[in-house]
Swiss-Prot record:
General function of this protein: Involved in a peptide intake transport system that plays a role in the resistance to antimicrobial peptides.
Alphabetical list of SUPFAM superfamilies matching this protein: P-loop containing nucleoside triphosphate hydrolases
Family: Belongs to the ABC transporter superfamily.
Name assigned to this protein: Peptide transport system ATP-binding protein SapF
GO-annotated molecular function: ATP binding; ATP hydrolysis activity
CDD domains from the UniProt entry: ABC_NikE_OppD_transporters (cd03257)
Record-level GO BP terms: peptide transport; protein transport; transmembrane transport
Species assigned in the record: Haemophilus influenzae (strain ATCC 51907 / DSM 11121 / KW20 / Rd)
Domain of life: Bacteria
Binding site for ATP: G45, N46, N47, G48, S49, G50, K51, S52
First-listed, main subcellular location of the protein, grouped into a coarse class: membrane
Limits of the ABC transporter domain: 4-249
Xref: SMART domains: AAA
Gene expressing this chain: sapF
Length: 269
């Protein structure tokens, strides 16, 4: 039984009104896939392809128009946000706008614990310190205001906030790809380490195919709301079956990859 099962997930938006009524378009159109435990699924595609809309439905931020999302074989209801938040958390793309700038880090991390648990303040503080340590931050960071942190530190806090309820799935919405190379490598290694230690499954949305080649077990390619390809990085990057995938690979790597690109990775490890 897969950890997450998405069946025919669809999101329809209403467009501008016209003489013939209000136009509708499917931002996501009957997308289906599964995610296994301790696996990473990447979602790629051009801007406007439906990637972010898809993961927002999975995270419970927006309701689907139709289709089902099953976690451990139990259907998730959009209205049951509190239950979903314990299992599926999201790290957003822009760390600068992801937090209330008036809060310190302790308050930011305490909020999900206060909402989702009946723990005492002492228990919550212990969990906050433990989670900060997991992402490489010291306990005394709890008293720092979020606005005084670097972008790398903010992303670590965002990851800590996602981790603190011990979810099985974390969605990362392009939160690594836009960072400087050295910071990106640090956070990439951190997420992989946490996956090994805690058994987390990731859904990674992004444009950095170099990162995706390194971390993903499977990839979904989106175009105009539809899933047009699904497979391993090696299959998709060496033998793309659609023009969209081919252009994405060639745009990033400068060419379609061959098998030697993975031999180099194995030797590096």
């Amino acid at each position: 039984m897969p950890l997450l099962q998405v069946e025919d997930l669809t999101k329809t938006f209403k467009g501008h009104a016209s003489l013939f009524g209000r136009n509708q378009f499917n931002a996501v159109d009957k997308v289906s896939f599964t995610l296994e435990r301790k696996q990473t699924l990447a979602i790629i595609g051009n801007n406007g392809s439906g990637k972010s809309t898809l993961v927002k439905m999975i995270a419970g931020i927006i309701p689907p128009t139709s289709g089902r999302i099953l976690f451990n074989d139990r259907e998730l209801q959009y209205q049951d946000a509190q239950s979903r938040a314990k299992h599926i958390r999201m790290v957003f793309q822009d760390a600068n706008s992801a937090f209330n700038p008036r809060l310190n880090i302790g308050q930011i991390l305490d909020e999900p614990l206060s909402l989702a648990t009946d723990w005492t303040e002492t228990q919550r503080n212990e969990k906050i310190f433990e989670t900060l340590s997991l992402v490489g931050l010291y306990p005394d960071y709890t008293n720092l205001n979020i606005k005084h942190l670097s972008i790398s530190q903010k992303q670590r806090v965002a990851l800590a906030r996602a981790l603190i309820l011990e979810p099985e799935i974390i969605i990362i919405d392009d939160a690594i790809g836009n960072l400087d190379a050295s910071v990106r490598i640090q956070l990439l290694n951190l997420t992989l380490d946490l996956q090994q230690r805690l058994g987390i499954s990731y859904i990674y949305v992004g444009q950095d195919l170099g990162v995706i080649k390194h971390i993903a077990d499977t990839i979904i390619v989106m175009d105009e709301g539809k899933m047009i390809e699904y497979g391993s990085p090696q299959n998709l990057f060496t033998d793309p079956q659609t023009d969209v995938t081919r252009r994405l690979v060639e745009s990033y790597f400068g060419k379609i990859l061959d098998e030697t690109a993975w031999v180099k990775d194995k030797n590096a490890h």
